[in-house]
Amino acid sequence: MGGRKYFGTDGIRGRVGQGVISADFVLRLGNALGRVLVAQRGQDGRRPIVVIGKDTRISGYMFEAALEAGLVAAGADVQLLGPMPTPAVAFLTRTLGVDAGIVISASHNPHYDNGIKFFSAQGEKLDDATELALEAALDVPFTTAESEKLGKASRAREAVGRYIEFCKASVPRAFDLRGVRLVLDCAHGATYQIAPLLFRELGAEVIGIGAEPNGVNINAGVGSTHIDNLAAKVRETRADLGIAFDGDGDRVLMADDQGNPVDGDDLLYILARAWKDEGRLRGPVVGTLMSNYGVEKAFADLQIPFVRSNVGDRYVHQALVEGGGVLGGEASGHLLCLDRATTGDGIVSALQVLVALRNGGQTLRQALKGLERVPQKTVNVRLGNVSAKATVQADSVQAALAAAQQSVAGRGRAFLRPSGTEPVVRVTVEADDATLMQETLDRLSAAVREAAA
């Protein structure tokens, strides 16, 4: 959202109590959104309705109350969803007939961060016109509607049940998990109630970890960013597999029956292969610049079209829409199954993997036998007084990059990525031989380091 004063591409996020992540600003934000929605409704006589969901971090109580007060003061009704995965809020916004949805979450970040993300009535990112109107409304003083036009707030008590039924509807009616022992790591986050309940209803024996949030333990040593915890529990309990979500439930990673971690690249391979066999796969599978070269090679062997987008689930989504595809994802566990959900949904994605395993009569480990990952490593080269763009475009760096790409041609990849958030250039090399990979990485990163000095 270039040129915006307050918002980035995915709402706002930061340290609680600093900048826009404050109760004062969020109160004004709720009021501004309420006024925009009231104006959009015009004279039809119905108050706009906004649903609010959150993850489990302690500051969510403060921001939920602030948003509620601001919206109600502007004349909008509010339905409080309580702790709810981000994709669930998108689904509920789309299906409850409301005007907008809000998620209070900082995803996989620590508890001391938080953020605000918006959904349109269609459960998608707000359009440019609404975003611009919201920015403009924030520069207008707080407004309280006349008493008879004030909004009301209520709890959406059927929200959990509706979302669970949606998740169940994403798998065949006859599918169940009877006889399956699985470990669920909910990151002490937004999936802590829904995920164990859902998988038990499907018949699984569920061993739960990371399902006791206290407001400050979200993502702390648990969840998809700490997969070793899940792996150890799988080995300890002799489970068939483990599933780990992140704090807001839009990412999923797994561990096989031996406790080996299974990342988003692995899960993408399992789904693509299964969906091709089922005739469900359409268009290209979309990965990112960071997807392992072994995945690309495996897809080529299977004659599955594969394209790469920039890093970030929104770019994966964009590439899928443009290419008419239905399956994409990144190693971090953001998976998009667009024939089942409009956004990345950790629970729905996990269910699709379990269906693929059941249909193929395979364990997680067996389903990965056709995939040979190659060694991959990234080095961050910190910049001096030279910009990232100038560093990457330097003749010496371009020559070193061309030489690196030639040395791993047909065996891997070498590429550079200027960071968008810090003064570094990321140097990545992968190859089917670890020594070749390391030597190539050393030469290329040295050239970048010299140009950046």
Curated annotation (Swiss-Prot):
Cofactor(s) listed: Mg(2+)
Entry's Gene Ontology molecular function annotations: magnesium ion binding; phosphoglucosamine mutase activity; phosphomannomutase activity
Keywords: Isomerase, Magnesium, Metal-binding, Phosphoprotein
EC number annotated for this UniProt entry: 5.4.2.10
Superkingdom field: Bacteria
CDD domains associated with the record: GlmM
Pfam families per the UniProt record, alphabetical: PGM_PMM_I, PGM_PMM_II, PGM_PMM_III, PGM_PMM_IV
SUPFAM superfamilies: Phosphoglucomutase, C-terminal domain (SSF55957), Phosphoglucomutase, first 3 domains (SSF53738)
Bound cofactor: record note: Binds 1 Mg(2+) ion per subunit.
Catalysed conversion reaction: alpha-D-glucosamine 1-phosphate = D-glucosamine 6-phosphate
Residues of the active site: S107
Positions with a binding annotation for Mg(2+): S107, D246, D248, D250
InterPro entries per the UniProt record, alphabetical: A-D-PHexomutase_a/b/a-I (IPR005844), A-D-PHexomutase_a/b/a-I/II/III (IPR016055), A-D-PHexomutase_a/b/a-II (IPR005845), A-D-PHexomutase_a/b/a-III (IPR005846), A-D-PHexomutase_C (IPR005843), A-D-PHexomutase_C_sf (IPR036900), A-D-PHexomutase_CS (IPR016066), Alpha-D-phosphohexomutase_SF (IPR005841)
A biological process term (GO) from this entry: peptidoglycan biosynthetic process
Gene3D superfamilies reported in the protein's UniProt record: Alpha-D-Glucose-1,6-Bisphosphate, subunit A, domain 3 (3.40.120.10), Alpha-D-phosphohexomutase, C-terminal domain (3.30.310.50)
Protein role: Catalyzes the conversion of glucosamine-6-phosphate to glucosamine-1-phosphate.
Protein name: Phosphoglucosamine mutase
Organism of origin: Stenotrophomonas maltophilia (strain K279a)
